[in-house]
Each structure stands twice: as C-alpha cells, then as structure tokens.
Regions:
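A structural signal for conserved, well-ordered secondary-structure elements
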Residues: 1-302
C-alpha cells in the first residue's frame, strides 16, 4: 500500500458501531412514528388558513394566541409570517360550520387590534383535497426513490442501487421519526424538504460510489472494505465542505427566517446531517454484503 493510502482515517473500525447506532435509531424512530404518529398540517388533514397584517405595529404572538384560544373552536395555530406585523392563523377542520368559526376569529382579531388590521387571504382545504394531497405526497416520495434506484442501477450495478436505496430509506425514516418525536407539523413544504433530502443524500452517495468504482479498477489487490475506506477518505474533504456550507445556510434560515420556515429548515438540517452519515456508514458498508468486486466493475464495462 502506498504512502498515499496509508495516511487515512480508518472508517472500517467504526462501521460496526455506526451500524448498531443506525439500527437502534431506526427502531426508535419507527416506534415513535407508529405510537405517536405525525402532526399533520391543514394541507393533509383539512382546515382553514388566514393570513393577516397588523396596521398597528408588531404583533405579540403569545398574547394573541392566548386571546384566540378562549374561543374554544378547536386547535388553532398562530405564527409570524414574514415581518413582525404579518401572521397566519391555522384552524383545523371540525364538524361545526367552518365559515362561522372563521367569522368568530375575524371578529376576535378585529377587536384585538381595534380594527387596525387587514385580512389578506382566507384559504380552505377540505377533506377530499387533503386526502388527495396525502396520496400525492406519498406518490412523489415513492417515485423519487424508484427513479434513484433506476439511475444507480443503470450507472453502476444492482449491488450499488440496493445500498443507495437502503441509505435513502434510512434518511427518510429517521427524518419522519424526529418530526414525530418533536411534533413538528407536516405540510407540503416538509414533503419538498424530504424530496430535497433524498436528492442531497443520493448525490453524496453517488460521489463515494463513483470513487469506489474507480478505485476497484486501480487497486486490484484490495478487497471492497479497503477500497471503501480509501474512497471515503479521498472524498471526505468534499463531503465535509459541502455539508458545512449547506448547514450554515440552513441554520441561518432556521434562526432568521421566521417561525413559518422553521419546519422546512429543521427537516433539511436533520436530512443533511443524517444523509452525510448514511452515505458513509450505511450505503458504503452494505456493499460488502453484496459481493462487489473488481469483476463487478469489469462486467459493468462490457
């Protein structure tokens, strides 16, 4: 082994611990998911969204939330939207007359701000539409996973595609489990975040897989474990720089972007961290169980 390949971090000795961690984490996330469920937003369970602007200055969200909760018309969510004068109210779908509930909220808001308020929009999502959105969200995630599987299968071999899909499923389950644990609201923006996570994680995995394929041709006398370790080290600087710069932007959105963007940015932060982890400690070690060798690469070239 050359000096270049000697001075490396030995990821091999950490694979077992990482696999134990991943297995326990997935079991925990699945348990939380099935026992606690997901906190679905009005996009998926129906309800009403009201966007409002205060004409009398900044809004005290806590005080406003306390005032509206006295109406006793169901679960109501109040969040800042953009500036400190803008906010949105989300009212879950109920068996009562929805228009009456909306009017009650409007009257309460008008009274709270002494009529110095403007109602910018009112959107209703019925049970049929919410059901269609749930199906569309599940279909979008399933199709993206299938497309990734097909892409990896064509570009590499079936062994690589299985490893990649395993890592992607790991990332999605972990992210949904964390959302269930902390009761973050699941809406369409979270579905978009999950699809972005799938693409980000796949990109990380493909970079490592491409280097593994290249090194399988280069180091004929090494096994897949040694090749994997060399390949991870060779792409490590790229992985760290990409992940850190992405996380820097996401943390900025989380802390500065306002409450309305917290869910999306939180999902992306979790996804980037776990996606980077899975590309190294889930997808790559799995290759040894699929008997990837130099012959696999040579067969691919023919």
């Amino acid at each position: 082994m050359s000096d270049k390949t000697k001075k490396r971090i030995d990821f091999n000795k950490h694979f077992k611990i990482a696999n134990i961690f991943s297995t326990c984490a997935i079991i925990f996330c699945l348990s939380v998911f099935f026992l606690k469920g997901l906190n679905l937003g009005i996009d998926f369970k129906g309800g009403t969204l009201i966007e409002i602007k205060s004409e009398s200055g900044d809004v005290n969200i806590k005080d406003l939330r306390s005032s509206i909760s006295n109406l006793n018309i169901g679960d109501i969510s109040v969040k800042n939207f953009g500036t400190k004068q803008d906010f949105i109210i989300k009212l879950e779908l109920s068996s009562k007359n929805n228009s009456e509930n909306v009017n009650l909220i409007k009257n309460k808001i008008s009274s709270y701000f002494n009529d110095q308020v403007s109602f910018r929009r009112v959107e209703n999502v019925g049970p049929k539409v919410s059901s269609e959105l749930i199906n569309a969200g599940i279909l979008a995630i399933a199709l993206s996973l299938s497309a990734m599987l097909f892409y990896i299968w064509i570009r590499f071999e079936w062994q690589f595609s299985l490893a990649a899909i395993l890592a992607l499923m790991h990332d999605v389950i972990f992210t949904l489990g964390i959302f269930s644990l902390f009761s973050y609201e699941i809406n369409l923006s979270i579905v978009a975040a999950i699809l972005t996570i799938v693409g980000y994680s796949m990109n990380d995995t493909v970079v490592i897989f491409d280097r593994i394929r290249e090194n399988l041709r280069k180091y004929n006398h090494f096994n897949i474990i040694e090749i994997s370790n060399i390949s991870i080290n060779e792409t490590l600087s790229r992985t760290i720089i990409t992940s850190l710069t992405t996380l820097l932007a996401l943390f900025s959105i989380y802390f500065v972007g306002g409450e309305i963007l917290n869910g999306f940015s939180f999902a992306m932060i979790v996804g980037v961290i776990i996606g980077t982890f899975s590309s190294i400690f889930v997808a790559t070690p799995f290759l040894k169980f699929t008997n990837v060798t130099q012959k696999t690469v040579n067969k691919e070239e023919k």
